[in-house]
């Protein structure tokens, strides 16, 4: 939060402590906030050997997710699909900056239909900052300096995303001659 405020962004946290909020409640907060982006930060748990940073954007309508074959439910339009290009641009900017700052194992930018990103009608991503199930990464995640570096890296990635959008909107459009 502080890293974003330093860069001039207004922030809204869906929670400040270990209070349980449903994914739907988190989505509702984002959807009623004008002109925002949504970044959900989690830590993974899998096997003790799993390590690395991965960032998820909503899979576009009609495409398979990173982990599954194409299913009939993939044809359903979701709120987050209104922002497909922005979702992947945000995921790429945040992921690249986070890898650079953290020197983590790169598990990639992936596509999924997780509840926390599928209902967001704003650009939104899910950042998995590492694996608590790994003794090496778990110890790293436990350190406040690591968590602050991750927060700063995410904020920097958001700044890079915004700069890219500003450049895109300032490029003059070619006129089409019929």
Locate each region found by the language model.
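Active-site-proximal helix/loop segments of hydrolytic enzymes
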Residues: 1-178
């Amino acid at each position: 939060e502080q890293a974003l405020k330093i860069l001039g962004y207004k922030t809204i946290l869906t929670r400040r402590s270990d209070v349980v909020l449903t994914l739907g409640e988190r989505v509702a907060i984002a959807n009623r906030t004008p002109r925002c982006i949504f970044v959900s930060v989690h830590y993974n748990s899998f096997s003790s050997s799993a390590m690395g940073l991965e960032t998820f954007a909503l899979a576009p309508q009609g495409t398979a997710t990173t982990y599954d074959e194409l299913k009939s439910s993939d044809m359903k339009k979701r709120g987050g699909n209104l922002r497909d290009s922005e979702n992947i641009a945000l995921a790429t900017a945040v992921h690249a900056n986070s890898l650079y700052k953290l020197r983590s194992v790169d598990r990639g930018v992936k596509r999924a239909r997780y509840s926390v990103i599928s209902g967001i009608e704003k650009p939104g991503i899910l950042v998995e900052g590492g694996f608590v199930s790994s003794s090496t990464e778990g110890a790293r995640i436990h350190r406040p300096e690591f968590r602050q570096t991750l927060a700063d890296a995410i904020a920097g990635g958001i700044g890079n995303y915004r700069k890219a959008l500003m450049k895109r909107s300032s490029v003059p459009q070619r006129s089409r001659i019929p």
